[in-house]
Amino acid sequence: MTELELLGPRASGEPLGTAILKAVAEDFQVDEVLDIPLSGQGEHLWLWVEKRDLNTEEAARRLARAAGVPVRSISYAGLKDRQALTRQWFSLHLPGKADPDLSRAEDASLRVLKQVRHQRKLQRGAHSANGFTLRLTALAADHQAVDARLEQLRQQGVPNYFGTQRFGHGGGNVHDALDWAARKALPEQRNVRSRLLSAGRSYLFNQLLAARVADGSWARAQVGDLLAFTDSRSFFPAGEAECADPRLAILDLHPTGPMWGEGASPAGGAPAQLENAIGARQPALCQWLAQAGMDHERRILRLPIGGLTWHYPEPDILQLEFVLPAGCFATVVVREVVDLVSAGQTDSPCVF
């Protein structure tokens, strides 16, 4: 499957040129934003860890081995890409135990930058955002055009697609999800099951978002839409008054799309008709997600880009810095500016 099939059309026009992302790990830096004050005491040891070319799950295994605890005793908020320089939190459950010597886990690919005790473990999804520093190299695009496009994105946001990382190489995770759905079965391995359910659900969401990008309604509220604030998981229906809410114009409030699961969509009007039409294309997949116990949830269609700045360290290098809500993909910002030329394997099954 192509990127266009997995995601959908761009909202800002054709790409302005080409560039390479992730030529080296330092070209893709991610800093987890966690708004939790740590108490300094408790049976959980929280670790601020820097990883280079190392995925989150392998880092967790190494930390657990060094601490002498089972891997189930370590927690993290979210998965980070392997081919990157990332900094994120982990927590170790150490009831009645002293702080372990973690030096055996450290090498050029992993460093423990900080250790703090706390009463609770780190929950999955606890981080509020991720900060990104991206260096696009071998840039072949007009700087003035790039500047204008980035200013446009700063003001209007981008479609909140799930990135290709979610779907595996060539959309393999989607193919596998469709195959399991057709057989009305689930993989026995928990991590495989989770990965394929996530891929199938994300694919359906992207199909819905692609249709709204195509008709120009992705950033505009319609009567019957369900609206949500950027950092909220709650939503409310849009009538005519809500469609004129000034918070839509300043990118605080957004229309949402369905994350398919058990239960009917609460949307109404034209948005509900479109959601039903998208679901009708893949009835087996929708039923599979519901039978797997996935709840119907919502995801904002428009992704606001926080604190977007950029400069050119060299004529053929563009450096971008910005913040995105947790669960959103930096690559969907980049694709609205340039086409990415591969400098090796840049996709991974991880989500930021």
Curated annotation (Swiss-Prot):
It is an enzyme of class 5 (isomerase). This is tRNA pseudouridine synthase D. The active site is at 81 (nucleophile). Keywords: Isomerase, tRNA processing. It comes from Pseudomonas putida (strain ATCC 47054 / DSM 6125 / CFBP 8728 / NCIMB 11950 / KT2440). Pfam families: TruD. Transmembrane segments: none annotated. GO terms for biological process: tRNA pseudouridine synthesis. HAMAP family: TruD (MF_01082). Belongs to the pseudouridine synthase TruD family. Residues 157-303 form the TRUD domain. It catalyses: uridine(13) in tRNA = pseudouridine(13) in tRNA. InterPro entries: PsdUridine_synth_cat_dom_sf (IPR020103), PsdUridine_synth_TruD (IPR001656), PsdUridine_synth_TruD_CS (IPR020119), PsdUridine_synth_TruD_insert (IPR011760), TruD_catalytic (IPR042214), TruD_insert_sf (IPR043165), TruD_pseudoU_synthase (IPR050170). PROSITE patterns: TRUD, UPF0024. Its EC number is 5.4.99.27. The keyword tRNA processing applies. GO terms for molecular function: RNA binding; tRNA pseudouridine(13) synthase activity. GO terms for cellular component: cytosol. Gene3D superfamilies: TruD, catalytic domain (3.30.2350.20), TruD, insertion domain (3.30.2340.10). Responsible for synthesis of pseudouridine from uracil-13 in transfer RNAs.
